[in-house]
Amino acid sequence: MTLARATELLKVQIDMGGEYNRNSAKMILADVSNEHGQAAVDQLIRTLKLDDIFDLKEGMKFRF
């Protein structure tokens, strides 16, 4: 998945909010981690403020 596509999908999850969407965001970040590494995940968390919205912190590892 491209980072642009990941950003697009994460914005949808942010707009809907809720616990299920937090889990979806974690799955998207796991895919980003597998393809682009932890730095890309941390950048998305910072850029989209996922720490405030879903309590997802920089440095967290996402795997599936």
What does each of the following model-derived ranges do?
Residues 1-30, 62:
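N-terminal acidic leader/helix
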Residues 24-62:
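Short, charge-rich amphipathic interface segments used for partner binding and complex assembly
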